[in-house]
Amino acid sequence: MGDTMWALVFDRSKDEWAKSRGLRKQQVPRPHLDVSRDYRDSGEVIVKTRYAGFCGSDRGIWFRRAFGDMMAESLDRERKDVRVVGHELLGEVVEAGPEAERDYGYKPGDVVSTESHIICNTCYQCRIGDNHVCETARIIGISHDGCFAEYVKLPAQTLWPTDVKKIRPEVAALQEPFGNAVHACTKVNLRGKSVAIIGCGTIGLFAVAVARALGARQVIGVEPMEAHIRMARALGADAVVEPSKRTESSYVHDAAITAELLRLTDGVGVDVAMEMSGSNAALNTAISAVRRGGHVIMFGLKSGDAVIEQIDKVIVEGITLHSVVGRRIFETWHITRNLLESRDPDLHDLIWKVILDEGRGTVVPFAEFEPESFERAIQVHPKVLLRF
């Protein structure tokens, strides 16, 4: 192995954030372990990337809609200009530091995925078990070099052993984003419940399948895109409500969707409404459509302020709002593994056949990466993988 490797990067010495888009494929230094120079390398691992998934946050970076400040601050701290992007990984360990081998058991040849949040283990949240909201967490591919590269250097504590005899590698590369849906769907007990999933993008589609697998009595999607409507139905949605074009204020709930969700639940409202789109109006629609005493799960992310209509309804009707970020480390990963390794129901094959379309246009060889065609792919498919 040489001293350089190919990677997809944001290079601020060549591209001004506000005036550019996409990622550059260029050679960067290949990561190495050298405990004699940096004692922290003892707990690090070098992973050879096999598959890397393109996430919604990567889309935010590609189109310069999100994470610019976080990336700039981390590059300033590291005194460099290039950030290797990407955090959804399946790879093979090629080198492990002494501590990584002794304390975590990693050795060359092990197949792993990774949690995308590098936690400190010392802040108050980490010490009480809420490490998924670590105070100083770094995010792989944003504030730490990521996996859109031939090799990636990661702390052993973030890695997750994966059996590719039980989970096909393309699906195994999606454990991290799939875990977002698992976290959302385990915030409350869904067994026997009616669930509305507002926004059937990638994580929303995962949530449809997970909610069904976890025993939801009724799963209803809300989604405008025809292709995603078909996928939601194929993944187990009993019904999918298609919103109409609207001219109202950006935060006002959709009365037509609310009426349809009430009709589908005999006028009661859904037990659980999941807002997966990041739309202020969708959040208010979720609140308006949930039953008295019900739960609203907020996963969709949008920066800035939001307006909640009729806050008195939330209080008087006993509606509980839950926010979801990332995955509970590593509780969610254990549930994810069990769901994907199970063959009843076969979520594994549903993901491969429905979301990844058995690799047709969704698995792109890294060697053939070309910005224009790749951008078309990420706009057509809910999930795209790079194969190394």
Please place each PLM-identified region on the residue numbering.
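N-terminal Rossmann-fold NAD(P) dinucleotide-binding loop
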Residues: 204-205
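C-terminal hydrophobic helical "lid"/dimerization subdomain
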Residues: 1-3, 284-287, 330-388
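A generic alpha-to-beta junction signature in SAM-dependent methyltransferases
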Residues: 188-189, 265, 277, 289-291
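Adenosine-nucleotide cofactor-binding segment
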Residues: 197-200, 212-283
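Glycine-rich beta-strand-centered segment in the early N-terminal region that forms part
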Residues: 31-53, 67-124, 163-165
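NAD(P)H dinucleotide-binding glycine-rich loop of Rossmann-like/cofactor-binding domains
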Residues: 75-87, 120-198
